[in-house]
Amino acid sequence: MTNPRMSMYSLASEAPGGNRGTGQQSTQVSTTTLLNAIHNIYLSAQPYRLDAGTSTVVNTWLTASQTGPNGSIGGTVDASLGASAWEHARRRAEDGCIVLGSLHESTPSVLAPFLSSLPMSTPSSLYKALDAIQPFLRCSTPYNPSTPRQAALGVTLTINLAGNLTAASIALSQGGIDTTKGLMNIPSEAGYRAFDVFYYLLTSASTPAEREFLGLKPASQYALLARSGTYDPPSYLPTADDAAAAEDFRTALKEIGIKGASHRSFISTLAGLLKLGNTLDYNVDEDVLEDVCEDVSGLLGMEPEVLMKQCTTEDRSTFVGGLYEALVDWVITKANVAIAAQMARIKDGAESLDGRGVRTPTSNEEGEDTVCISVIEIPNPTLGKALALRGIFDDSMGINSEMIADGIEVPATGSSVLREMQNAVAEVAPDLGISSTPASRERQHELEKREEILEKIGLSADDDGFIKQLLFPVAGEGINLGTHSRLDLPALLASSRVWYHLSLHPTDDSPASLAALPSVTSAWSAGTVSRQLRAWRLPEWANRRNKNLDFTADFDVEEFVQRYSALGCKDGRDGIETWLLERGWSNGEVIVGKERVWMRESAWWEAESMLDLKPLNNLPGVGNMMAVNQLESGYSNNGSGYFPGQVILDDHSGSNGVVNHQRNFSHGNMSQATFNQNPVAAPSIAPTRMTGMTGMRNVAVGDYGLGHKGDTHKGAVYYNEDGEFIGPLDPELANGKQIETKSLPMKRRVWVFIVWAFTWWIPSPLLRYVGRMKRPDVRMAWREKLVLCFFIFLMNALIVFWIVAFGRLLCPNFDKAYSQKEVDTHQGQSDFWVSIHGKVYDISKFWKQQHSDQDIETTRENMLPLAGMNLDDYFVAPLPLTCPGLDIEDTFRLDLNNTLEFQIADHTSGYYQPNPATKLRAADWYSKRFEPRIKEYFHGDLVWSKGTVRKQGENDGRQWVIYDDKIYDLTNYFYTQKRLKNLGGSNFLNEKLINVIKQNPGADVTDQWNDILERAAGNATENQSAQNSMNCIRNTFYKGITDFRETPRCTVNNWLLLAFSIMLCAVILLKFVSALQFGSKRRPSPQDKFVICQVPAYTEGEESLRKALDSLTALQYDNKRKLICVICDGVIVGQGNDRPTPKIVLDILGVDPKIDPPALAFKSVGTGSEQLNYGKVYSGLYEFEGNVVPYLVVVKVGKESEQSKTKPGNRGKRDSQILLMSFLNRVHHRSPMNPLELEMFHQINNIIGVDPELYEYLFMVDADTSVREDSLNRLVAACANDGKIAGICGETALQNDEKTWWTMIQVYEYFISHHLAKAFESLFGSVTCLPGCFTMYRLRTADKGKPLIISDGVIQEYSVCDVDTLHKKNLLALGEDRYLTTLMTKHFPFMSYKFIPDAYCQTAAPESWSVLLSQRRRWINSTMHNLFELMQLKEMCGFCCFSMRFVVFIDLFGTIILPATCVYLGYLIYLVSSGTGQFPLISIIMLAAVYGLQALIFILKRQWQHIGWMIIYILAFPIYSFVLPIYSFWNQDNFSWGNTRIVIGEKGNKQIVAVDDEGYDPRSVPLQRWDDYAQANQLPGRRGGYPEKYEGEYQDQYEMDEMKSVYSSVRQGSVITGMQNRQNPYMPPQSPALFGTPSPGHMTRHSTMTGAGPFADPHLAHRQSMASMGAHDIQRTQSPYADYPTRSMGNLHGHASNPSLMGGNRSSTALGFAGGNRAAEASSSTFDFQRGLAGPDDGMIVEAIRTVLMEVDLDTVTKKQVRALVEQRLQSELVGERRTFMDRQIDHELANM
């Protein structure tokens, strides 16, 4: 090896040429990366290295109670972190501190498990001490069955430089214990308990003598314990038993020396505190107080007056808390004494634990150097967060300030992170020793007050009593509680090298719910874990540390030279730098500062490993680090018992020595698509169908490194055993016609049955040959259309029939009956009505004629006064003529009860006519001349209401009655009798009949008269008299008939119509009221939410496009927070355009015409092969009127086979919407993306400079719409004020309103549809149609961040490809915008969908009849089908009839009956104009009210111009309500059906056949996660680069004028096109991980200390020495940082990454090194490193097969499933010979079982 820079010791030497950068970690860690990694390590019970000094684990009480992968219990811990701290401490002779932080209040303690994982033996007394101490510190809460209440608990382990433990101690921090929440004032909610020790005291484990002495009662009798009412431990715990725990507790107390007298004093004090708690109520009774104090004083050894008289209630409360804390300090002191005693016995050899552990020989030198490793448990997430953030991000203190002072470039921390750190520190300032804050001063005041109270009570206690021992532990020092034997946490962290072990909790669910889960790791909430990651700023943490500050070792220059001189390092800075170059450490692995040398962990351990290879006599000593008894200790040359010495393969040493060395590679979350191939050669997908892709694994395998089974909503694929696609996305492949049969839903089956039931009589051959409908699905759609049109026609006919004819059927002569009041209204010259003897006559054509043969002229003056009158008294028939058989003389006549007002109109005929010359003189004039002539003008019957008849008969003396519904008025008859006194023949009528009238005036006498007539029938004379009298009454006294129009038969229809009219009017009125929104326009404050302005472009012209883009650019909204996203739906030349629409868009935006980015594959909404589409992405900045806004243009260009077609790439507006929605969905879920989406992400994230996940709103604007400047801000402000708003729209007006007649008739419709319909719906928060031309949707909920419009459910239903029925066609092909609103309402019924009139835009309306006809056909049909869908939704707001469901029904019904409405209006016009029927007053009033209220709306809004538009609209009403609906209904099936999928039968099942279509194979669109893709291509923006992405405000990361489009300006390395000549990226150096057999000096050593505590590995009771690990698998590294398969140097051609970032840094714990081969165990971990491109060898495959076969149920599993499980275990896709070998070996293993 001639080039020293290619040293075998440096991983950098294996990176191919090219720039190496600065050594910073290139991988950008994001929340998604961490979330995915942590989910995987949670499932596999593994830790995750965030950086070299930080590890994360996920634990619950359930996982902590299970046996881990290495056989230990207590939860997952990272043993390698402890090993790293141990190595640094002993090798560097520096103190270390391991912080066990908790990110969630529910995480279990890992203190004991972590201690047991350290690479040293620990005394059993340490674990017993923890068992004894923990009940004092922990209590049960609803969120954690064992919640620690201390600020921090530390275990300090003192080791010598050989790594042996020499001392151990336990201490609380000066923050003490939270006695308030743990004892004094526990929450009063169920589930909370006080400290466990009190319940142990009260259990039956106490002896009867103790209970009698202490006077213990049930827990409910103690105020301190009874607050929550919870006295038992959580029942979901498998070991929830206070009695058993109390027994273990008492045993632990004995082990640490608390027994006998000290135990009695101890429990007396506990009981005294418990009882004293009953005196802390301010309202306690005096007698109770005295009794309790008397009892307690005896237990505590003091006078009762001290507690009762000298102490207030507050003093006693302070005393209880302070004494308890002092008691805990005393227990800890006793524990430390016990630990020290055992350590002394071990050192003296006086104690051996009978081989239960390996004995660790200790040094006999008294003055040997020692260092301390402190393990600090900080259970409070707030305190832990403050300490951690300050240590990582605060550059003014700690190691960060030292590096800055030494000249190391430390990037400034983001302001949002600093703010969060400062807020966290301020919250716990007292615990950090910061005394300048109000909280600190308050804490100090409380401590001083506590000290005074404790001193007062303590001095009054017995001199030799236990209380004085507790309160005055050091004689002469007074009260020193909180300082004596406590840890100074800030000072400890400042003086030690800090390592972080962070515990996360997977869910916010209660611990009780975990017990019911199907598996230990079923509990998972990505939101919960993500919140913890973001709260602690772990992505920024990882990026900051790994890129710049991940130095774990630092030396003085002289110290560095002395340490590594044996490896060739020369004196001085120049010598060091030269040596670093020889090692290949020129990329930031080691940095030489002004005075110190800083090393990353990998470089440091590489150097230390090389030292281990050197002979003993060549090693320099550093102080006393190399003790004389090193070989005796069994450690390696460099003193390492954890890393065995390495075998040198030749005689050379130094940089040219050849060592069998391996490399560690991590794939983390990377897919196989990037791992197994050149990770830099990004795919450039041409618009053609490809079988493979550069940089991607061959798609024939079909899983893209993600497995055969993917996300069902994001590109799921399924394959059979031969690798052929069999999934549900599309059954058609390019292998001819295939038939697919699938069952139909019941609704569809019923509908098909109905269609055939109505259209069976139409033969299909007729449709096929005459109608030219060759396809069955087209014929079926025609039949469906016919049935729908029939139903629509039937409904319209029923409506017209109901309104017009139904009432007449029920009441035939309804319009032939008139009351006298109605007759009185007809008094015009051409409307001359009169009533005569119960009949109504219209003599309008008669009265002007000269009909008198006397001297009376027929003039207006004479005739018009008679109009509308009752003329009974003017036309009196002679009695002999009308009453034959009654012997009435010709000279007799009845006198009139009334005086004639107009004498000239008197038509007396017969004998009493005084003028002999007139024809009236004739006795038969009335019957022969008058009656025949007047019948010509008969118009109807005169009707009287029964109430009128009764009232006038009873009250007014009118002698009339009702007989057979006819009215007879005999008033003149009785008047004549009265005047003649019954003489002169005035009694000519039957007396019995007359008596009935006298007795019942105004009544119905039908029964009485019939009775008389029946009786008279037996007597001929009587019968003759009665019949003649009845005949006379009918002829002479007939007055009319009863008003039958008042009967139920005639009124029921009117009442029904009136009821519906009232409901409609109520809706109209409510709509009117909702539209009355007065007041000045509110001016919301400027908003700062990120918004994507989506503009789908199809065939619009340049003027429309420019208006739309300019209006969006000029919006009064932060330019950096809006993104214009134009999606061109195909390369299409619109009518009137001279170039394709995409070219117009790019020309407007100023994109360089030379730019031609690659076409990238994505899945479109289409059928068959049309699902495969290609698109191009452009980005840059657009400037208009000083506004510079970023834009993104996506052009759908189609496949190569489409280029000869007229519309390549065109898939419809819905596909354009889905393209962006799907992209944002995958951004939200961090899901694998297709190539087009990856490029979009890159352009937005890295070129434009905004993380796509920051966008919160999607603003949809059509390409022919211009938006007013303030509209977007108003929409966003409305959403910001109401977090329930999921969609919102504004008013859309016309910008070409005066262009043509066809635009004019639309102006008023647009206005009123918004201000009446949408304003009304907005009241309910349920706007049923958010127009696609001007609508904004919220992407995710404001509270929990759940996706809304980008949710899986909405996208899945909106992106349906099989649009094969008439209903689906109308929903998805015509009214996609309305259907999108329907889907949003369906999936999120409790969200609001609003309309605000203040937001305003203008759009271009159709200017020609043909375009208007086409538009309204789509609108009307889609409205009808969408409203039908809405009717089926269950969750619709409202109550009673006034619900949205009712309104939707009204709208649906109104749409369907539009033609009926027009016909009825025409009928009304005819009635009014012709006068052929009754005047429709109510209908006219309703119409006037409807349009009057509409007019009132724009009048009140001062929109005067709409008066004219309203008139034009009314004139065009027949077009809107008749022509357009009829045309639309009949053209429901007018679609372009295509020929890809043909429905050939729907008789219970549906069959689909592919015709001339190659089909869509999902493998043609590979999917890959952004983080993996970005890492593989060395791209920035791996989801963690912007601190504003998490909590806090957005920090602008760029200046707008500095942003360059990747295509419109300088060509950059696109993520998709890649760089043809790029080599593998630089790989940060890793540990060489040397291995070999042990040196002769390596011997098995035995220790008298053991980790056999409750958390130790039960399988490793006889644990081997760390020096005996040389027998490990030859393919395993033996670094403390990893234990994973490695490979030889010859295979190092793939991309490697820092394992701490990508999840590969997964070492087995120290407890897991039992020697032997652990290949199977390692391969089972998701985070074990792969063997690179070489793949797993035969042995690994065989081992994986055997493991899988042992785990599965052979009776149910298939070979395919076994193969998948084996590949999953191997984390590799086996192909070719490897696959064949696997299949053969599976068969072999099955045969041998």
UniProtKB/Swiss-Prot annotation:
Knockout mutant characteristics: Reduces the germination rate to about half and leads to hypersensitivity to hyperosmotic stress. Exhibits a significant reduced pathogenicity in Arabidopsis and cotton plants.
Subcellular location: Cell membrane
InterPro entries referenced in this protein's UniProt entry, alphabetically: Chitin_synth, Cyt_B5-like_heme/steroid-bd, Cyt_B5-like_heme/steroid_sf, DEK_C, Kinesin_motor_dom_sf, Myosin_head_motor_dom-like, Nucleotide-diphossugar_trans, P-loop_NTPase
GO molecular function: ATP binding; chitin synthase activity; cytoskeletal motor activity
Keyword line: Cell membrane, Glycoprotein, Glycosyltransferase, Membrane, Motor protein, Myosin, Transferase, Transmembrane, Transmembrane helix, Virulence
Sugar-modified residues: 70, 164, 638, 664, 669, 897, 1019, 1023, 1421, 1534, 1705
GO BP terms, alphabetized: chitin biosynthetic process; fungal-type cell wall organization
Chain coiled-coil ranges: none
Membrane-spanning segments: 750-770, 786-806, 1056-1076, 1452-1472, 1479-1499, 1507-1527
Catalytic reactions of this protein: [(1->4)-N-acetyl-beta-D-glucosaminyl](n) + UDP-N-acetyl-alpha-D-glucosamine = [(1->4)-N-acetyl-beta-D-glucosaminyl](n+1) + UDP + H(+)
Membrane topology, from the record: Multi-pass membrane protein
DEK-C domain segment(s): 1735-1791
UniProt-listed Enzyme Commission number(s): 2.4.1.16
Domain Cytochrome b5 heme-binding: residue ranges: 815-877
Region of interest (Disordered), residue spans: 1-28
GO CC aspect terms: cell septum; myosin complex; plasma membrane
Family classification: Belongs to the chitin synthase family. Class V subfamily.
Function: Polymerizes chitin, a structural polymer of the cell wall and septum, by transferring the sugar moiety of UDP-GlcNAc to the non-reducing end of the growing chitin polymer. Regulates Germination and Tolerance to Hyperosmotic Stress. Plays a key role in pathogenicity. Likely contributes to post-penetration virulence.
UniProt protein name: Chitin synthase 5
Source species: Verticillium dahliae (strain VdLs.17 / ATCC MYA-4575 / FGSC 10137) (Verticillium wilt)
